[in-house]
Regions:
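Polytopic transmembrane helical bundles with strong interfacial aromatic enrichment
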Residues: 1-157, 162-164, 168-327
């Protein structure tokens, strides 16, 4: 086995744990919105004036919202630990800035969630939903940069010189790391735009504005009548088509390129799976008249598609050659 001189396994493992724990928070938040439980309690930060409100385990709306709050507080504490640990043990300035950004973002998330309740304002809920995606990507960036993989993207000649060579990532079809990065940034922008549109659609109650799939009730691709709910819903579908086509082209070129790290190829293949899963879930939302389970998973996997795309892109920013040493 090999490792880099600066690799800190415990910190790397903890950063992965925070990403894993955030998975539950994202699902809880998505489910809370899916069942319309965002205002299950009229107060904040307490719930009905208590940390353990009466009857919250028996009422679905109260259970969803209070669980979301408890998970949010727990993730906040984990993020604080991660930020402090990173500042103490990691000398890279940009890593410290990422750790600080994660802490600032999670505090902002908590405040936005509170403002959504105190002011009963869906605009805060929309911003809260979008910032959650940014927070997840920051955590993924920290976890990636703490990994041994970050320091040596491609291993050449295990048992020989054992050096990681970024130059070997140059593709014979022009799919260089810079090209992967550029197209990845474009895709991240498209997906984040889609997440914003989805949040607006979701919180404005337009999830069934076009109640049939894939065509409109009139049997057309484009609606005959236009209102804001129909327009935002159609925009969500149209952007999904664009993202799917661009993503497939990007990921397939990565997978077919022999000189790209096999692990990056695996991530690209996983992205393709998520794309088709998202299309299926989007259809199920319509066909089940917005059942909470497919709706929540559609939101949840959308966040991880964004994070996965960013992860592939983020790895292309690392261009140092780092030697490794045996344990």
């Amino acid at each position: 086995m090999y490792r880099t001189a600066d690799h800190k396994p415990k910190l790397a493992l903890f950063s992965l744990f925070v990403v894993f724990a955030t998975t539950f928070l994202l699902y809880a938040g998505g489910f809370t919105t899916s069942i319309g439980a965002g205002m299950a309690f009229p107060d904040w930060p307490l719930s009905n004036g208590s940390l353990n409100p009466e009857g919250w385990l028996e009422d679905q709306a109260m259970l969803a919202e209070h669980s979301h709050r408890l998970l949010g507080a727990s993730i906040g504490l984990l993020t604080l630990c991660l930020a402090v640990w990173t500042w103490k043990k990691d000398s890279r300035k940009w890593m410290r800035m990422l750790a600080l950004a994660s802490l600032v973002t999670v505090v902002m998330q908590g405040l936005l969630g509170g403002f959504r309740v105190l002011f009963n304002n869906l605009q805060f809920a929309m911003i809260h939903a979008c910032l959650a995606q940014v927070y997840l990507c920051i955590l993924v960036s920290i976890a990636a940069a703490q990994s041994a993989w970050w320091r040596r993207p491609i291993l050449v000649g295990i048992g020989e010189s054992a050096w990681w060579r970024r130059t070997s990532m140059r593709a014979n079809d022009g799919m260089t790391p810079n090209r992967v990065k550029s197209l990845g940034l474009i895709l991240c922008s498209l997906i984040f735009t889609q997440l914003i549109v989805g949040a607006i659609m979701r919180h404005s109650g337009a999830g069934l504005a076009i109640p049939t799939f894939p065509l409109t009730p009139e049997g057309d691709l484009i609606p005959n009548n236009w209102t804001f709910p129909i327009a935002i819903h159609f925009a969500h579908r149209a952007i999904a088509v664009i993202i799917s086509l661009v993503y497939l082209c990007w990921a397939i070129r990565i997978i077919w390129n022999e000189s790209i790290d096999p692990r990056i190829k695996c991530l690209g293949f996983l992205g393709i799976i998520l794309i088709f899963t998202q299309i299926t879930l989007g259809a199920l939302i319509i066909l089940t008249y917005r059942s909470p389970i497919p709706t929540t998973f559609h939101v949840f996997l959308g966040a991880y598609l964004f994070a996965l795309t960013w992860l592939i892109t983020f790895f292309q920013f690392k261009d140092e050659v780092v030697p490794i040493e045996p344990y």
